[in-house]
Amino acid sequence: MEGDASDPEPPDAGEDSKSENGENAPIYCICRKPDINCFMIGCDNCNEWFHGDCIRITEKMAKAIREWYCRECREKDPKLEIRYRHKKSRERDSSERDGSEPRDEGGGRKRPAPDPDLQRRAGAGTGVGAMLARGSASPHKSSPQPLVATPSQHHQQQQQQQQIKRSARMCGECEACRRTEDCGHCDFCRDMKKFGGPNKIRQKCRLRQCQLRARESYKYFPSSLSPVTPSESLPRPRRPLPTQPQPQPSQKLGRLREDEGAVASAAVKEPPEATATPEPLSDEDLPLDSELYQDFCAGAFDDHSLPWMSDTEESQFLDPALRKRAVKVKHVKRREKKSEKKKDERYKRHRQKQKHKDKWKHPERADAKDPASLPQCLGPGCVRAAQPGSKYCSDDCGMKLAANRIYEILPQRIQQWQQSPCIAEEHGKKLLERIRREQQSARTRLQEMERRFHELEAIILRAKQQAVREDEESNEGDSDDTDLQIFCVSCGHPINPRVALRHMERCYAKYESQTSFGSMYPTRIEGATRLFCDVYNPQSKTYCKRLQVLCPEHSRDPKVPADEVCGCPLVRDVFELTGDFCRLPKRQCNRHYCWEKLRRAEVDLERVRVWYKLDELFEQERNVRTAMTNRAGLLALMLHQTIQHDPLTTDLRSNAER
């Protein structure tokens, strides 16, 4: 059974006149139905047809089957087994079917009679031997001329090519397999993009082609070696160009480079019946001619067959003996284009850059070849050769030379530094003086805020000692319009102005407690009391950094007793203190809600600002001192130098800067 299982063959001519569903219609498959309007597969032993749905075989699965037998035949003869085809033969058969397979009257494909000999030849291995076998088995092609090698060598080569896949043509032991870099001079390397070629051959470097498993046409043969036999190595006259096309398809040379405009007169056209249905040819399907094969192995990829290698100066690396034995091919003269010139210039520039990179990346290559070319060590009194890629023979020589340089240069630089004043040094001193003045003012401000803090605590303590007056007017806002409403800044609800402060304070505490402000370290400030909350949160592993008096998350307002006085200091004209206190009960006073907490928060916030200012000034002072220290250090004196053109004038500043 062939790989494409198609619809069954139509019935005989006598059955065409009968109805398809009639009584005399042929029946198929294990279901014994005459239905032929679906995918079917035939047994290669009993020639019985079966529906794919009944035996659970799809059309895609049938394409991978070479011979299929039904269950009854396999039970009768256990030697019958379903055979599957390889991927290469499957693709080749599908391409042959698309071009030349006969079709029946209903549009379906007919299954040709299986030919075991042809299948055995089609399943042969790759290589020259397999190509010759397939070429002789083709009914449309004449048998090719025999090669010089003996039949035993051909059989051995066929077995070797069958065992070796295309993707594993490396023995790993020869010199070509152990080579890791491209030569950059052969035709395959010059075709690569990294060497400026068009990348159309797409083969490995010839020096990296395995000498045991690679194709003969890809191997590198120097002038001393030759892939041909001694009988063929003798010089022979070149074959003249054919004046008329000869009907021998075995003399074609594979794929020609159409885009380069090369026309090979030695390649003869195929007969009309072969070219009527074009099909993609692989390297295995191409027949070979012995003479052309020897010429191809000798020098098919020389400067005549590769148009982009037409420069004589660039093709000098090819062996002249191989060029003489190359196939004579006609070329069509191409027009000179600017793109080709640009490619040549780009290739030359790339070669120069590559040589420069190799020189710096691998300096030990040239040194290893010529030990006498190694430079002498630069160490003091050392006569040894320097290490590859270094100026010294060892680390000790480098350290000795560096120490001698310091002893010789540093005293002179220190003397120059002391003689001429440094502008940056003077600017640094002025900046330090300004920073110190700002630090002093910040400390004074901090002391003032500490004094205000203690004064506030004294005022709060004295206010709590005041007596509550019941006869004092407690409803000062009753005369206002009771219909007036304002909106809360936190929740946006309308509220009465009399209770606005109380409502807004509670709303703020509720929303503020939903967010945490923390640091990984607690605050430690000498002389500061009651500044940050600093409550440790074990979940986030942080310390709370809100003000202690305003933190709604870790502190709550104490419960106010009924007889506690408000005690808020009364003012005149907003800022002028009168010296009196509010003596209303704290529960009834709506004007001075939480006045102690707000006053304490005001003082604490100002103290925090002063501490931040001091911290910033300390950081500036540290940076300036570090710069001044490094300016006269060893590294700075060795790297930088100021040249004094007038030795009598040591001060290089202008009169305005002095």
From Swiss-Prot:
The modification Phosphoserine is found at S6, S19, S226. GO terms for molecular function: histone H3K4me3 reader activity; methylated histone binding; unmethylated CpG binding; zinc ion binding. There is a cross-link at K252 (Glycyl lysine isopeptide (Lys-Gly) (interchain with G-Cter in SUMO2)). Pfam families: CpG_bind_C (PF12269), PHD (PF00628), zf-CXXC (PF02008). It is found in: Nucleus speckle; Nucleus. Zn(2+) 1 binds at C171, C174, C177, C210. The modification N-acetylmethionine is found at M1. Residues 1-20, 84-164, 221-285, 327-373 are annotated as: Disordered. The modification Phosphothreonine is found at T229. Residues 327-336, 348-360 have a biased composition (Basic residues). Keywords: Acetylation, Activator, Coiled coil, DNA-binding, Isopeptide bond, Metal-binding, Nucleus, Phosphoprotein, Transcription, Transcription regulation, Ubl conjugation, Zinc, Zinc-finger. Residues 428-470 form a coiled coil. Residues 90-120, 337-347, 361-370 have a biased composition (Basic and acidic residues). Zn(2+) 2 binds at C183, C186, C189, C205. Gene3D superfamilies: Zinc/RING finger domain, C3HC4 (zinc finger) (3.30.40.10). A zinc finger (PHD-type) spans 28-76. SMART domains: PHD. A zinc finger (CXXC-type) spans 162-211. May be regulated by proteolysis. InterPro entries: CpG-bd_C (IPR022056), Spp1/CFP1 (IPR037869), Zinc_finger_PHD-type_CS (IPR019786), Znf_CXXC (IPR002857), Znf_FYVE_PHD (IPR011011), Znf_PHD (IPR001965), Znf_PHD-finger (IPR019787), Znf_RING/FYVE/PHD (IPR013083). The acidic domain carries the potential to activate transcription. This is CXXC-type zinc finger protein 1. It comes from Bos taurus (Bovine).
